[in-house]
């Protein structure tokens, strides 16, 4: 079970159910300052989309629309890290890689990418919140989280997935 979830690995064969929760407080900067809150980050853009193609054979169109919406709303900043959905499914990981390459204008322009699903599994409804918390912690600590269980590269998933070892980096803008 420890090696069952293998995001972006050539030998991935499906997601592993996880269990977890993440919580974030979203409030105005002024309110956070007024109550003396420790501010971990700022939400500068978001996107949402549905992929109505088919539940088990999605395309990259839905995720790409969401990514483009968030990126445009944020003012198209230099992104230092992407915490990918990275479900360990052959179709999703390939489509997500293609969408990231399109968003950033090619493989050579993509920031480092990782998926935490090798560590925690797919926490379904909690996945987005957990991934946002991981982005904030990565920014706070200056550490790119690894994609664990990555051992065999896939020609369709050819980005820098931060394989197996965390990496120090300055992270100003992260995308999840």
Annotate the PLM regions.
Residues 85:
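Glycine-centered flexible beta-alpha turn that most often forms the glycine-rich phosphate-binding loop
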Residues 1-17, 98-129:
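Conserved catalytic cysteine-centered active-site region
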Residues 1-31, 127-176:
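Conserved beta-strand-centric core segments of catalytic alpha/beta enzyme folds
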Residues 66-74, 103, 135, 139:
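Stable alpha-helical structural segments in soluble proteins, enriched in small hydrophobic residues
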Residues 50, 68, 81, 91, ...:
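Glycine-rich phosphate/pyrophosphate-binding loop at beta-loop-alpha junctions
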Residues 52-63, 88-104, 123-130, 163-164:
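Short glycine/threonine-rich loop-to-helix capping motif typified by GTGT followed
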